[in-house]
């Protein structure tokens, strides 16, 4: 099976690094998916969520305010100005990281419809856990 390695890095450090099945990125021209063996690409990313699917078909999400994606030879590297990995071992930790993610995206998004759609998608992924 072909592998796809994802790394998400901010000026504060690494937020995520693991092998994944696929990833959906918030490109400047719209969302796009990346699978193993994707063509090489560099893209500007807008404020939104990165939807990460692991080999067990579970989804994780990382909210970013903006950044760049470099896709090359089975590896996706995201350089983001700010990122929040929405995760937690308890309901309160998960709710806290979700609130941080909402604030991060809201601080960068001037489009209220896009912001509402992004928040709804984030909440749906969290509920599905």
Swiss-Prot record:
Q: Where in the cell is it found?
A: Cell inner membrane
- Membrane topology category: Peripheral membrane protein
One GO CC term on file: plasma membrane
Q: Where is this protein primarily located?
A: membrane
Q: Annotated Gene Ontology MF terms?
A: ATP binding; proton-transporting ATP synthase activity, rotational mechanism
User: Any keyword Cell inner membrane?
Assistant: yes
Keywords, sorted A to Z: ATP synthesis, Cell inner membrane, Cell membrane, CF(1), Hydrogen ion transport, Ion transport, Membrane, Transport
Family according to the record: Belongs to the ATPase epsilon chain family.
Note the subunit structure: F-type ATPases have 2 components, CF(1) - the catalytic core - and CF(0) - the membrane proton channel. CF(1) has five subunits: alpha(3), beta(3), gamma(1), delta(1), epsilon(1). CF(0) has three main subunits: a, b and c.
In Swiss-Prot or TrEMBL terms, this protein is called ATP synthase epsilon chain
Provide the taxonomic classification.
Bacteria, Pseudomonadati, Campylobacterota, Epsilonproteobacteria, Campylobacterales
